[in-house]
Structures are given as C-alpha cells and as structure tokens.
C-alpha cells in the first residue's frame, strides 16, 4: 500500500475520491462530505491503482486540525485508516489535536474514533424551520424594535440583526436562510429576550421571503437547542464532534 501526500487534488484523484464516497454512501446513508478544495493536506492510500482511503486535514487554529476521512467498506478494520492517520500526524506540529465529525448513522466510524480513544466533545445538530412554519410567524414580532444591517462576509451576503438585548446573523442563499452567531448579552439571558429576538427576525424574514431557515446548534447548549425546538425547528441530522 502506498500513501500519497499533497496540498491539492488532481482531477483524476477527485474522480477516485467520488467513487470511494459513492461506495461508502451505499453502505451507510451518512451526510458527511469530503472537502476536495479547501484542506491543507490530503492523504490518499492506494493499492494497485485502487483508492482505499482518503483523508483531508484542515487547519482550524495553530494547534487544532479537522480531519475528514473515508475508507472503502471492504477495506475497513485492516489498519489502513490508522496508517493514514499516523502519516498525517507526522505532517503536523507535535502538540496538534484533531477534530473528527462523525455521523451516528455510521457504526464503523464510531468504532474507529472509539478505538483511537478520542473524546466526545458534543453532538452538533443541523436544524431547519420549514418555509410554511416561517410564513406562520409573519407579523408575530415587533420588527420596529429591530435593527437590520446589510453586510458582506467575503462574497456572502448577510443580514445582521440586533436589538437592545442581543444579535444574530442570517446568510442569504437562493433557496434558504442560514442562521448563526446568535448572542444574548451577559446578564440578560434566561429572561425571554432570546425568544423575542428570534421571533422578530423570523417575522422579518417571513415578510421578506418565507424560505426555510437552517442552523447548526450544539447539543451541549441545552437552552439554545430548547429555544429552537420550541420555535418549530426540527433536527435534520446529527454529527458527533470528537477530539483526539
């Protein structure tokens, strides 16, 4: 088995990775994808021209890298991922920690991170409020008490909402909105101000265009997760975040 290392992928390598992903998705209907463009290091395990395992390392900060890896279903439990991981760690500073996102629909992935001794940090929930639920909130919030600012993050158009108690951001996409950066000021939490701000923002979006609203929330933040569920958001997928 040969393990190649690069900072970018060739068209041929991408094609091989897509075939590998297809084999994995057929075995387990996971939602994880492979970052073919933005990673800092790519490690590919080959045997006789056949791609057995692909891993990507993406720098999060000076001492933390996110690791995304897929191994062919018929090649698992043979030490291939372990060999790729060892090679990947040799590229990084000695005290580097790795983050793994694991779809609970993949028992093999859960088994792999457990065998590594990785620590479960949190469950990350992708949630969505359907467009009809957004429409139903129209007129419920007093949007007159809301400041709305248009801005750009790189090439992405966003709306920044704020009131006297907090703020949140909405990324604008053609088919949906993405909610992030929801903060209520210290000392004002647990008093209903988060619910009020969220309803005002959703009412504004319903007036603008009632598209689905998506977000990613941490299972470790119980109050926020409870707020989203009370407002009508539903879990669409759950990824477990592990630290190694």
Question: Where are these predicted regions, by residue range?
Answer:
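Short amphipathic alpha-helix that is part of the acyltransferase structural core
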Residues: 1-32, 119-165
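Conserved donor-binding loop and adjoining core beta-sheet/short helix segment
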Residues: 8-9, 29-83, 92, 166-180
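A structural microfeature
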Residues: 51-53, 122, 164-166, 194, ...
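Residue-level recognition of the GNAT/N-acetyltransferase active site
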Residues: 68, 72-76, 103, 185, ...
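Conserved acetyl-CoA-binding loop-helix of GNAT-fold acetyltransferases
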Residues: 77-90, 181-184, 190-207, 225-230
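Conserved beta-strand-loop-alpha-helix junction that forms the acyl-donor binding cleft
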Residues: 99-110, 214-225, 241-244
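Conserved active-site tyrosine of GNAT-family acetyltransferases
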Residues: 109-118, 228, 233
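Acidic/His-leaning functional-site neighborhoods
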Residues: 155-162, 167-185, 189-190, 195
């Amino acid at each position: 088995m040969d393990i190649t290392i690069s900072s970018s992928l060739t068209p041929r390598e991408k094609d091989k990775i897509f075939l590998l992903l297809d084999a994995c998705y057929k075995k387990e209907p996971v939602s994880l994808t492979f970052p073919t463009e933005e990673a800092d290091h790519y490690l590919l395990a080959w045997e006789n021209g056949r791609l057995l395992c692909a891993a990507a390392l993406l720098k999060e900060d000076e001492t933390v890298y996110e690791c995304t890896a897929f191994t062919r279903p018929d090649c698992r439990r043979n030490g291939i991922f372990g060999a790729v991981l060892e090679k990947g760690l040799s590229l990084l500073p000695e005290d580097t920690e790795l983050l793994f996102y694991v779809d609970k629909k993949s028992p093999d992935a859960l088994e792999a991170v457990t065998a590594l001794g990785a620590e479960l940090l949190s469950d990350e929930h992708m949630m969505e409020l359907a467009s009809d639920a957004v429409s139903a909130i129209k007129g419920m919030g007093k949007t007159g008490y809301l400041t709305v600012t248009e801005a750009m993050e790189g090439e992405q158009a966003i709306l920044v909402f704020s009131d006297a108690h907090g703020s949140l951001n909405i990324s604008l996409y053609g088919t949906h909105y993405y909610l992030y950066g929801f903060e209520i000021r210290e000392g004002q939490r647990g008093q209903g101000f988060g619910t009020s701000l969220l309803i005002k923002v959703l009412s504004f979006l319903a007036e603008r265009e009632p598209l689905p609203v998506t977000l990613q929330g941490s299972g470790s933040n119980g109050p926020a997760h409870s707020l989203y569920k009370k407002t009508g958001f539903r879990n669409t997928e759950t990824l477990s975040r592990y630290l190694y």
